[in-house]
Amino acid sequence: MSKTLLAGYFIWGVFFVILFCLRPGSVLHTITIEAKSRNTRWLSFLTLTMTILLCVLPMSLSPSYNGEKPDYMNQYELLTESFLEGHLYIDYDDIDPKLIALDNPYDPEAREAADVSFHWDHAFYNGHYYMYFGVVPVFLLFLPYRLLTGMSLTTYHATQIFTALFIAGVFSLFYMLGKTFFKKLSLGLYLTLSTAFSVISVWYAVSAPALYCTAISAAVCMEIWSFFFFIRAVFVCETDRGSIRYAFFGSLTGALAFGCRPPIALANLFVLPLLAVYLKNRKFTFRLGKQLLFAASPYMAVGVLLMLYNYARFDNPFEFGQAYQLTIADQSHYGSFFSRFQPLKTFDSICKFFVGYTPMSDQFPFVSFNGILLNFPILALPFFGIASEGVRREMREHKLTRCIMALFCIPLLIAFTDVLWAPTVLERYRMDVYWIICLLCFLIAGLYCQNLTPKTARKFSCLLSIWAFLSICKCVLLFLVPYDYNFTFYYVQALEKIRKILMLGRGVGLY
């Protein structure tokens, strides 16, 4: 028997074993999330570990992202060296004088006509190259690693770290929500949804981990922990002192997200309904005002530092460098945010963001990139679940109504920002909102479970767990699509080998 056939039997064997474990009669659907035993703790830890490994290990496969052929993907490493040298620009020694001489160096047609040599996807201002991606990862990982080891941290390793911390944040947040609000939630549904929603949120970073996804993974990592701290402060902590302490850390991680990827940081608006819940039964006093000011102080401190950083580079505290990009479009004349707003065009782009459809491919792995709800139909669950009177009643009882409404609105706001500022909407931009919709889906699923009889709850847990597992499989197929210089883009022969393994050596060739 060939190795290809053995590998195929093994993979399909694992597939059916997992389906067997998720069968309707499985004990995973009868044990609740509150169960306390050594076996459940080990199972949870094993699931978390396997999820992290599933997402982190494949990041090293593509030479464009693992450091073998860095091209322009090593900007974080270069900026770290620039900081150590005492300046904010990336010190390239090959700046083309023709680029400086152009009246508008940001016009791609003008650059092509003048045959200009330049560094792709950098910000260029006053004769210097800058990195316009969020600077916070430099201070969190790249600089400490460089100072401690004397070596540069390869960019994709930072993405691996942020991704692992994000996944740990998802499992922690979902567990806390389950213990607080969803006493009837089964252990199996908690584990499968935590795994699936972690993978859905970061699958693109697994495929193309360096630079762009370093900033994105850092931002979603900061935000998921910000949500964890804020929700714990409002719904779990029993003392004001504990609540303010957790709110401070929520503010700190939420503020740092602005220095990673600003559109994702718009999720900080989730603080507003949480604050309303916190203040509802409290009398506002001078002491409470001081406590809230302390809790919010990281927003002010980080905001001031980011504005100073922007001003030092671009003479504008609100300019992150987007207007000075050397890329596919001239963004220097985009004007104000709302001057670019065209109702019909913007509406069309937002629709494509969420429900855009691309026909399936006739080549392995057959899937194509679609809008969020077509990529992963499981994420449409909240739009149906919210129609249940039982779900709405649970929302009111747990004071979650405003919070859930905010989670419906925030993805639209982030999508609106993405489609207005970007010259074209790319697949990686959907990472900005996947995690929020996943959180919303978990909340609605948990609330729905509370109104079911034990028998119906087991069936619901089984069906949704299997759906979550199949969504993970869809992520694997999307990872295999040759795109954006990823692993299968470089190694077509590897894609063909994977096809043969999954099809047990049968079927026609890729080409």
Show which residues each predicted segment covers:
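Start-transfer (signal-anchor) and selected internal transmembrane alpha helices
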Residues: 2-71, 188-191, 244, 286-298, ...
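Interfacial juxtamembrane loops and adjacent helix segments
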Residues: 85-133, 196-207, 327-363
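Transmembrane-helix motifs of polytopic, lipid-linked glycan transferases
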Residues: 151-183, 224-229
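Transmembrane-helix signature of polytopic, membrane-embedded enzymes
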Residues: 170-201, 221, 238-245, 399-402, ...
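Specific aromatic-rich, kink-prone transmembrane helix
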Residues: 218-238, 249-254, 268-270, 436-440
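Membrane-interface alpha helices of multi-pass inner-membrane proteins
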Residues: 224, 245-261, 268-269, 293, ...
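Perimembrane helix-loop-helix junctions
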Residues: 267-303, 393
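Hydrophobic, aromatic-rich transmembrane alpha-helices
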Residues: 359-364, 370-401, 440
